[in-house]
């Protein structure tokens, strides 16, 4: 029988790998909390119709990449490929009109059937931030600045911000008519994939990575020439406010993002350290999405960050585990019982405590404590347990003033003083 293996494009993460993940997630949550952004959790599994209506039937995500199946009730279900549509659905279903202004974040696994490579998996993890009900340029700038600051805080190098405006629905409609006419006239000069997009999702051709097509597109109509005065003024104000905040940017007039729901501001943050998979964060405004899905007219803007790519880029210092504060060495039936009780008591001090359960010799337990670089150790043998006491010392030191103490199991005050003087004040 063949050995069971994980599916291609999924990975197992073990404790030593998760140190960096947990440190990255901790920093993310700290930054979001400081910005007064609240968490929302939505199901991983949704009705397929949600993504067809929300993302767009002609997008690559919906047409090629979704994990979709019929459940036992013959309903078409999909593992979520992104989070914005689910957030919009949740807000509509639960009465967005009662709280129209919200700043929300979510984090969790998403699923897309793509070719796996470094920083890209079929099950991947994403942080998303959504500002709901906010329509001012200031909210665009705030969310871009938040994404920029989060990535900077994580020590990501060679950051570049690319921005564009997609205008409103009328702007885009007028541009698309002209662009389609141009595409038909230049169809034979495009790569095959772009030719296939003409009838399905022509705007995505602007984002083509094909060298030949990119050269041809240099002569294509520009969306910026079809902007209304209002849309143009909004874009100018976006750039002005970014400059006030000293956030450097580059205009990319072909930046359209991969989903149909974007309007006005679109942006990506890339890192030169990532090579071909340079995009770390992408987002934009989606003022029509909630209304399009059956809710009230609600402006919104958001971004998403792929955690796998963050892990590749984040600083090495985030791989360093927190050292064990106290390692409890114990040997003997009576000692084991006391050690178990003591470990529970010590964790109330917000200490990282490891209780040795191996039953190995004292010397082997000392070696394990040394390997873990434990700051201190407690030693309990049956002799100490019978006397109702234990030895606590800073690891590697013995008989050095208050660095080592013999403490009664009942003397909580003496134990607390030792911890305060030797661990918590360090």
From Swiss-Prot:
A GO cellular-component term linked to this record: cytoplasm
One GO MF term: histidine-tRNA ligase activity
UniProt xrefs under Pfam families: HGTP_anticodon, tRNA-synt_His
GO biological process terms, semicolon-separated: histidyl-tRNA aminoacylation
Keywords: Aminoacyl-tRNA synthetase, ATP-binding, Cytoplasm, Ligase, Nucleotide-binding, Protein biosynthesis
E.C. number: 6.1.1.21
Catalytic reaction equation(s): tRNA(His) + L-histidine + ATP = L-histidyl-tRNA(His) + AMP + diphosphate + H(+)
Family membership noted in the UniProt record: Belongs to the class-II aminoacyl-tRNA synthetase family.
NCBIfam families to which the protein is assigned, alphabetical: hisS
The protein's name: Histidine--tRNA ligase
The organism's taxonomic lineage, starting at the top: Bacteria, Bacillati, Cyanobacteriota, Cyanophyceae, Synechococcales
């Amino acid at each position: 029988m063949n050995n069971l293996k994980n599916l291609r494009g999924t990975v197992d993460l073990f404790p030593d790998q998760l140190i960096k993940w947990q440190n990255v997630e901790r920093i993310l949550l700290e930054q979001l909390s400081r910005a007064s952004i609240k968490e929302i959790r939505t199901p991983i599994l949704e009705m397929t119709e949600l993504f067809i209506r929300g993302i767009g039937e002609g997008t690559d995500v919906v047409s090629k990449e979704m994990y979709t199946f019929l459940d036992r009730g013959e309903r078409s279900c999909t593992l979520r490929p992104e989070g914005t549509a689910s957030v919009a659905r949740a807000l509509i279903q639960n009465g967005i009109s009662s709280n129209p202004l919200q700043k929300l974040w979510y984090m969790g696994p998403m699923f897309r059937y793509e070719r796996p490579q470094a920083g890209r998996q079929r099950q991947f993890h994403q942080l998303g931030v959504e500002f709901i009900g906010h329509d001012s340029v200031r909210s665009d700038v705030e969310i871009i600045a938040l994404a920029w600051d989060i990535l900077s805080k994580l020590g990501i190098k060679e950051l570049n911000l690319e921005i564009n405006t997609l205008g409103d629905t009328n702007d885009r409609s007028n541009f698309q008519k002209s662009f389609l006419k141009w595409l038909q006239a230049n169809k034979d000069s495009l790569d095959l994939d772009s030719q296939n997009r003409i009838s399905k999702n022509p705007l995505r051709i602007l984002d083509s990575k094909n060298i030949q097509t990119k050269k041809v597109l240099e002569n294509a109509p520009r969306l910026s020439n079809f902007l209304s005065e209002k849309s143009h003024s909004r874009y100018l104000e976006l750039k002005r406010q970014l400059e006030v905040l000293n956030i450097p940017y580059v205009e990319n007039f072909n930046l359209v993002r991969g989903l149909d729901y974007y309007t006005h501001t679109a942006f990506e943050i890339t890192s030169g350290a990532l090579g071909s998979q340079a995009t770390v964060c992408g987002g934009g405004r989606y003022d029509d999405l909630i209304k399009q899905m059956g809710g009230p007219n609600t402006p919104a803007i958001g971004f998403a960050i792929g955690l796998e790519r963050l892990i590749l880029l984040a600083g090495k210092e985030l791989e360093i585990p927190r050292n064990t504060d106290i390692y409890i060495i114990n040997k003997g039936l009576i000692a084991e019982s006391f050690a178990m009780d003591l470990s529970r008591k010590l964790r109330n001090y917000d200490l990282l405590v490891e209780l040795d359960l191996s039953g190995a010799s004292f010397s082997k337990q000392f070696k394990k404590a040394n390997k873990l670089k434990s700051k201190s150790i407690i030693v309990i043998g049956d002799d100490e347990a019978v006397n109702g006491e234990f030895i606590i010392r800073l690891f590697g030191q013995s008989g050095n003033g208050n660095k080592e103490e013999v403490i009664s199991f009942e003397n909580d005050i003496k134990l607390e003083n030792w911890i305060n003087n030797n661990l918590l004040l360090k």
